[in-house]
């Protein structure tokens, strides 16, 4: 069985999942050749953010500066009213963490602070504000090709050297209000008020290239702590190889320089057509492969992938209209050595919770809901054959 990265949600219409299957060594070599040629010919990838916004429900777009002015105008206002107002907005640029913390301090209460957190999470799929990007000339095609080759080499060598390890995965789940959909398919324009619907903490094992959730941490509970709502899996490696391999059969091109925590990052934008995609969306018992797009931010000196977004293209007839994931990677210490591993992830999905039949007998959504997960990874440890994972809810796990 190939390794799988999955983004799934339990909804009224059934299980909706988003799979990425990893490729073999031969495909990775093909990716190196194909990606290099694409960088050399300089293919241009169209901006897909307009398409993404078409999936949303009439929210008003604004910059971080405009958001700051709205909060200043509502200083001392009623917390619930400010939260409701903020829920009607979406950012048109990524909100930096430092900017977010400053905005949170000016929020009147917990409801508006929660809404700001969600607004920031939703914005992680966007580019930063132009004023926050480095002023630096784009690399020439030869430099682009070299960086892509470094990335393919990184995937082929570095990931294979990762030790078996385990880490703590902490997930906070958010959900917007259910919104009615008109018989003509137009979504209600009312802003969904976000709320926190739960959280979970599990131990994740990475062993022999596969991701496993330690069951001993939840076996005494009535249900798996991550069952229900939106669940993300497979961010430790397979998703990286699969996206790069798929992109080698699609299009990839230079996008921008970006400031990272440890220096300047090189960002490439990619698109994968449905015919070459190993990404699928399943609703109930029906599974449908579809195209996807996103961007990948790499260290230009080493090729290490430090940030990745995957955004599903709209699927005709699917009850899921959005299913996206972002993963950030950073240096972590495992067994006395430094490795690049996931440190944070944001997943978002929007889909139908209730379906009706129209006059033609086709099923159409009558209610829609948006769900979002904010995930943090930490407490990494090397996993040896004699390791014992101690949990608070069950006995130690031996391997």
Task: List PLM regions with ranges.
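Residue-identity detector for glutamine
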Residues: 17, 21, 32, 38, ...
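Sec-dependent N-terminal signal peptides
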Residues: 1-24
């Amino acid at each position: 069985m190939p390794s799988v990265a999955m983004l799934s949600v339990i909804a009224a219409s059934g299980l909706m999942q988003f799979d990425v299957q990893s490729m073999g060594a031969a495909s990775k070599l093909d990716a190196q050749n194909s990606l290099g040629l694409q960088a050399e010919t300089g293919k241009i990838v169209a901006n897909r953010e307009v398409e993404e916004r078409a999936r949303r429900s009439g929210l008003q777009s604004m910059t971080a500066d405009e958001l700051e002015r709205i909060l200043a105008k509502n200083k001392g206002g009623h917390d619930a009213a400010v939260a409701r107002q903020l829920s009607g907005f979406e950012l048109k640029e990524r909100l930096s963490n430092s900017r977010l913390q400053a905005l949170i301090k000016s929020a009147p209460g917990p409801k508006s602070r929660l809404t700001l957190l969600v607004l920031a999470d939703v914005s992680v799929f966007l580019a930063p504000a132009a004023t926050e990007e480095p002023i630096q000339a784009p690399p020439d095609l030869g430099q682009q090709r070299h960086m892509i080759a470094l990335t393919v080499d990184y995937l082929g060598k570095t990931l294979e050297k990762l030790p078996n390890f385990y880490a703590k995965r902490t997930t906070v789940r958010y959900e917007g209000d259910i919104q009615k959909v008109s018989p003509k398919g137009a979504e209600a324009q009312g802003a969904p008020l976000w709320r926190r619907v739960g959280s979970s903490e599990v131990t994740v094992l990475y062993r022999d290239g596969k991701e496993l959730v330690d069951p001993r941490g939840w076996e005494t509970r009535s249900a798996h702590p991550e069952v229900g709502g939106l669940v993300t899996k497979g961010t430790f490696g397979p998703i990286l190889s699969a996206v790069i391999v798929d992109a080698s059969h699609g299009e990839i091109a230079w996008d921008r320089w970006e400031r990272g925590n440890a220096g300047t990052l090189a960002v490439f934008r990619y698109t994968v057509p449905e015919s070459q995609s190993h990404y699928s969306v399943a609703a109930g018992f029906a599974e449908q492969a579809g195209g996807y797009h996103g961007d990948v931010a790499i260290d230009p000196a080493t090729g290490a992938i430090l940030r990745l977004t995957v955004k599903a293209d709209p699927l005709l007839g699917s009850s899921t209209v959005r299913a996206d994931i972002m993963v950030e990677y950073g240096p972590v210490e495992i067994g006395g050595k430094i490795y690049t591993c996931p440190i944070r992830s944001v997943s978002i999905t929007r889909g139908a919770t209730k379906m009706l039949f129209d006059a033609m007998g086709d099923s159409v959504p009558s209610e829609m809901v948006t769900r979002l997960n904010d995930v943090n990874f930490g407490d990494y440890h090397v996993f040896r054959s004699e390791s014992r994972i101690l949990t608070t809810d069950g006995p130690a796990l031996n391997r």
